[in-house]
């Protein structure tokens, strides 16, 4: 595996790969890689000839009181994990390489409406930071495909919208959620969960699973279901941020006759903010 720190060197390596007729897949990450990230890499490998992974802890998508400085930097372990699965390229730029004029002067990419709801409501500016850095990475790498995990469903939907609106020639591929044995979605932020909280940290997944059961049983009073699901999270000792039943494409509140819906939620533990989601196709119901 070759590691690059500079934009020009990445472009040269990928240009050579394309001259050899190879297709390129891209997996953007913030590092601290775990099995779910590696699953995305393997998924990309099954679809293209060459896979490049980026590791960049993007300050632009962290809020004023968020954990940018605490976010785990594990580049040596990350590099070893990627090499072990025969990843072709690792792009590991620093902030000066990505934002040479400083973040305040950086041109921003904003996806209206979708970025201000759900996680965007409690993390203002977060998705603006995501779409800005991802659009920049797409321009650097120019991949044929890019793989994003479904766990960050709102991010996935926003990236799809951005690619569609800006006519970026990349296919967005969704990677399934990888879960721990008890259903907790794998996340780099799981390392912030305290040992005391960990046995019940799957409560968000359990509440969304309960929500799914109610909907499959025919219940369509979505606001009442959302309130009940949040109550279940509170009863387990955690603080819900939101539980929302949404149209899978637009992220707008789902109508009772919507056939493709996604159940999204976020909750706070003492040390972490966790997100999860489940999607339903009600066409056969």
Swiss-Prot record:
Q: Where does this protein hold beta-alanine?
A: 61
**What residues does ATP bind to?**
30-37, 149-152, 178, 186-189
Q: Where are the transmembrane segments?
A: none
Cited CDD domains:
PanC
Q: Where does (R)-pantoate bind?
A: 61, 155
Q: Gene3D superfamilies recorded for this chain? A: HUPs (3.40.50.620), Pantoate-beta-alanine ligase, C-terminal domain (3.30.1300.10)
Task: Tell me the protein's name.
Answer: Pantothenate synthetase
Subcellular locations according to the entry: Cytoplasm
Q: What residues form the catalytic site here?
A: 37
Q: What is annotated about its quaternary structure and interactions?
A: Homodimer.
Q: What does this protein do?
A: Catalyzes the condensation of pantoate with beta-alanine in an ATP-dependent reaction via a pantoyl-adenylate intermediate.
GO biological process terms, semicolon-separated:
pantothenate biosynthetic process
Which GO cellular component terms are attached? cytosol
Keyword hit for Ligase: yes
Any idea of its EC number? 6.3.2.1
- Hey, which family's this protein in? Belongs to the pantothenate synthetase family.
Organism name: Teredinibacter turnerae (strain ATCC 39867 / T7901)
Say yes or no: keyword GTP-binding present. Answer: no
Query: Could you share any additional remarks the record makes about this protein?
Result: The reaction proceeds by a bi uni uni bi ping pong mechanism.
The UniProt catalytic activity note for this protein reads: (R)-pantoate + beta-alanine + ATP = (R)-pantothenate + AMP + diphosphate + H(+)
What GO molecular function annotation could you give as one example from this UniProt entry? Answer: ATP binding
């Amino acid at each position: 595996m070759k590691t690059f720190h500079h934009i020009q060197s990445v472009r040269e390596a990928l240009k050579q790969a394309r001259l050899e007729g190879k297709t390129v897949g891209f997996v953007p990450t913030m590092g601290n890689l775990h099995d779910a990230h590696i699953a995305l890499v393997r998924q990309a490998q099954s679809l293209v000839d060459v896979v490049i992974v980026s590791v960049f802890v993007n300050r632009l998508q962290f809020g004023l009181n968020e954990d940018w400085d605490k976010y785990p930097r594990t580049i040596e372990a990350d590099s070893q994990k990627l090499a072990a699965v025969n990843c072709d390229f690792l792009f590991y730029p620093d902030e000066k390489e990505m934002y040479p004029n400083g973040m305040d002067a950086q041109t921003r990419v904003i996806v209206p409406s979708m970025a201000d709801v759900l996680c965007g409501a409690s993390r203002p500016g977060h998705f603006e930071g995501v779409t800005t850095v991802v659009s920049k990475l797409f321009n650097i790498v120019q991949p044929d495909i890019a793989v994003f995990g479904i766990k960050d469903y709102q991010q996935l939907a926003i990236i799809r919208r951005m690619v569609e609106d800006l006519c970026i020639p990349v296919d967005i591929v969704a990677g399934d959620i990888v879960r721990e044995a008890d259903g907790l979605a794998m996340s780099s932020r799981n390392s912030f969960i305290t040992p005391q909280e960990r046995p019940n940290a799957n409560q968000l997944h359990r509440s969304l699973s309960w929500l799914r059961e109610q909907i499959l049983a025919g219940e369509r009073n979505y606001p009442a279901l959302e309130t009940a699901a949040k109550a279940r999270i509170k009863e387990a000792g955690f603080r819900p941020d939101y539980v929302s039943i949404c149209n899978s494409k637009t992220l707008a509140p789902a109508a009772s006759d919507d056939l493709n819906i996604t159940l999204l939620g976020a909750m706070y533990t003492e040390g972490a903010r966790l997100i999860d989601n489940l999607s339903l196709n009600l066409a056969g119901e």
